Amino acid sequence: MMLEHVLVLSAYLFSIGIYGLITSRNMVRALMCLELILNAVNINFVTFSDFFDSRQLKGNIFSIFVIAIAAAEAAIGPAIVSSIYRNRKSTRINQSNLLNK
């Protein structure tokens, strides 16, 4: 694929993720949008790593590191959301006032 096509795909994914993160009122949806943003960044890392110097794997290694961070976020995030749901009976972001108490 050409570089422009991959970058446009990544920009679309990033834009959808940012839009969803800004407009989301549900914590689960916000976590999913955050994953979209991280995947768009990974696509950019791998694309630029392959385009500029395919012999060095710096972009690929950094992408694997971001995937590991995203896996930890995907494991811890729903646990935090379920804990908030048990205590507050809601997963809406605007109803979470945990720092006010």
Swiss-Prot record:
Gene Ontology CC annotation, any one: chloroplast thylakoid membrane
Superkingdom of origin organism: Eukaryota
EC number: 7.1.1.-
Known catalytic reactions: a plastoquinone + NADH + (n+1) H(+)(in) = a plastoquinol + NAD(+) + n H(+)(out); a plastoquinone + NADPH + (n+1) H(+)(in) = a plastoquinol + NADP(+) + n H(+)(out)
Cited Pfam families: Oxidored_q2 (PF00420)
Locations listed in the record: Plastid, Chloroplast thylakoid membrane
Quaternary data: NDH is composed of at least 16 different subunits, 5 of which are encoded in the nucleus.
Alphabetized HAMAP family for the sequence: NDH1_NuoK
Name of the protein this chain belongs to: NAD(P)H-quinone oxidoreductase subunit 4L, chloroplastic
Organism phylogeny: Eukaryota, Viridiplantae, Streptophyta, Embryophyta, Tracheophyta
Gene from which this protein is expressed: ndhE
